[in-house]
Amino acid sequence: MSEIKKENFVHLHCHTEYSLLDGHGRIKNLVQKAKDLGQPALAITDHGYMYGIVQFYDACKAAGIKPILGVELYTTQDIHEKKDRKTGHIILLAKNEQGYKNLVKIESIAAVEGFYYRPRTDLKVLKEYHEGIICLSACIQGDVPQLLLEGKQEEAYALAKEYKDIFGEDYYIELQYHGLEDQKKVLFPLVTLAKTLGIQVVATNDIHYVEKQDAFAQRTLMCMGMKRTVDDTEALGYGNPPHWYFKSEAEMRKIFDGVAPEAITNTMVIADKCNVELKRGEYHLPKFPLPATIKSNVQYLRMLCEEGLHRRYRKDAETHRERMEYELQTIEKMGFVDYFLIVTDIISYAKNHNIPVGPGRGSSAGSMVAYCLGITDIEPTRFGLLFERFLNPERVTMPDVDIDISPEGRELVIQHIIEKYGEDHIARIITYSSLAAKGAIRDVGKALNLEEALVMRVGKYIPTGPDVTIAGILSKNKAMKKEYDENADVRKLLDISTSVEGLIRHTSTHAAGVIIAPDAMTEFVPIQKDKNGAIISQFEMGSVEAIGMLKVDLLGLKTLDVLNAAEKAVNSKKQKGEVKLDLTRLKMADRSVYAMLSSGQTTGVFQLESAGMRDVLRKMKPTCIEDLIAAISLYRPGPMDSIPKFIQNKHNPDTITYAVPALEPILKDTYGCIVYQEQVMQIVRDLGGYTLGRSDLVRRAMS
């Protein structure tokens, strides 16, 4: 295999799929193209937002490409004026860590204070936060090129000089040429302006898709966003030639060597200037505000745990002390003391204000410390739950406690968090909605102006459900394949729909996630406002976790409000002196309840009400809480295949066999079936001789 030739050119103006309904190039494909061409670096400059920064950074690092982190922002004279919708463009690239921090601040100000139809910045903001940032004059929509187009040469020169005064040698006049008339008009005037003012020029290609043949798909995508059709020439915006693809150095030199050859060389100069590292393995935990009498967070956590140990276990407290001490030492060693104090405070606040909170879910139920602190109400040893599944000293990751909470009280709890840590320290988390198969076909059909009947007919081939892809259905459905082969409109519809399938359609706010930062949120994460005016991160859940932010999941669960209302309704009928109903103290061995469940009378019962689950309960005939836990755990894709064996073994215990005797104590409660990930960990520990920490690594590799 021949060695890839190294190119001396870098693309510094590149739109990914995070330029919503405009960027067609997926990050992984753009990065791979840079690698294939031998280009040493690549920039991300999405429209208005920094959504894809972390994914882009990771993809570049994995491919051996230097990531250049940036954004294409909109400019206005004064971000506080909300009258004129007209904006210019600039490209901002981070040179170093300080530059990246300033980029986050500029972006956040633009998306919060400066937002008027789109995020906007101005010279005043740029003056304050310019350190460590390179500025390019952007595309034909840049404010300097626009002034030249309008014949306002003096104003163009004056504005370019202002940018130069702010950024110095890090301000560049950006040159682009895609055959547009407006670009022809300003190309040489921009070169002249740069020479006159002593500003360097740089060549870019304003990438919106990877390959030349992707042009029509990208144009269709753009029309989807504009709610127009490809027949509407106004929607096309930038002419017919497919020039906005990922070009090689040779292709770029062919355009610019006769204009300003240094514009190509300067891409490497800029790339050499940009050296940002997004550090991993660091956690940005806020300090929990301690009572005046407490000297340290460790002292306070231990005091609360000691109180909880005696409250939870009473006379058996000492028998559980060893495990609690092990957990505490692990928490202290891993540096997560403040995390536990913060979560404890949140749940305590909710309970003290009569806001229903769930008993605990997920791996946090395996922590005795969480149980003693009141974070969970599930005693871990009774159910064989393992602390290492939650917090593994051999795999340092942030703890993750999911908190089920009353939807009616959720905002009150969030307000408490804001008051405790400061409004500028808190943000909800963004989430992205992608174009699913059926939706892609519908939207592409509209953009292509195809007959509605045809689009609806093709759409009916696509079933609803997760993991459904157009290509997957096309490979299995003969009728659909026949139409694809014989009908050109169907083929065009499905080809373009497949091309845009999975791209981000719009953003919304995550139902549960809240970030708490040790300093102002904009020291770590770019922010914006959601449609309700709440501050949200521009990074989605995975990116927030990747950069080490503390995330708390407050999941509004309506069932908690229903249970709370039911408890109150029952108690309102109680006579004076009668024992009040307390749902937290219900007996788990009530035969009449299991008889009702076994008959499938579970309509309205959380997680047990679907027709399929009712059928499982009728066949399983649960007799204990462990049976219910197993039923819920098994009733999902994959593990569902084990349900018949589980039921068979439950009703015929004499037929249960174990591959080796050591499996019996681990699998006895689940009738010889492996149901839980904790069982996997125990098997690896007992049969493989691993520690529980190492066993957890095996579990993660399997899951």
Which residues make up each language-model segment?
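Alpha-helical scaffold/interaction cores of sigma-54-like transcription cofactors
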Residues: S2-S703
